[in-house]
Amino acid sequence: MPFALYTRCMGLSLYAATTSQGKLRDFAAAAAAHSIEVASLPRLGKIPAPEENGATFAANATLKAVYYSRYAPGALVLADDSGLEVDALDDAPGVRSARFAADAGLTDSPDANDNTDVWNNMVLLQRMAGVHPAQRTARYRCVLVAARDGQPLYTAEGAVEGLILDAPRGTGGFGYDPLFYLPDLDRTMAELDLETKHGLSHRGRAFAALLAQMKI
């Protein structure tokens, strides 16, 4: 079910096309920095998800924004596509970040659907086994697209550089956060509080860039 971000002072509604609770928390933190409230909109009901078959983050974010905007006439619909790019893996998992374990054939496991992050991290660790610490460079990348009535209007991108650890650290965040290490902070993404994470994360940077384009 999509979620809405809206600012009362401008009378603007943004529908964020995501059911990811982790992404919703990130958006909430980003929105709070701009005095924007985040709320769910159950009146939209359940909308069937489109097939994410784009080859890039921008392509997937655009197709989702355009698709969901047709269900909310007149409103701006915000879609995110993001993931992890690991240099030693030729930028994999990339657009397949959420399905890394599934692509490795782990969907037959009875726990795969309930522990997707755990399985994805396990596959990443397996693929990175034996890679020298200096060669474990990676980045989180996010592309946000806002569309109205089937037309994309704004596109913004954010990225943050880091390293992939050989074991998880921290209990916060989601996705690959326990393995994504920030050398300047000596912390993983999973060890950061939400406010700090928003200030430097790929999604926070993309969100700030999008709002700047929209002059919010």
Task: Please give the residue ranges for each predicted region.
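Anionic-ligand binding patches
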Residues: 11-15, 21-216
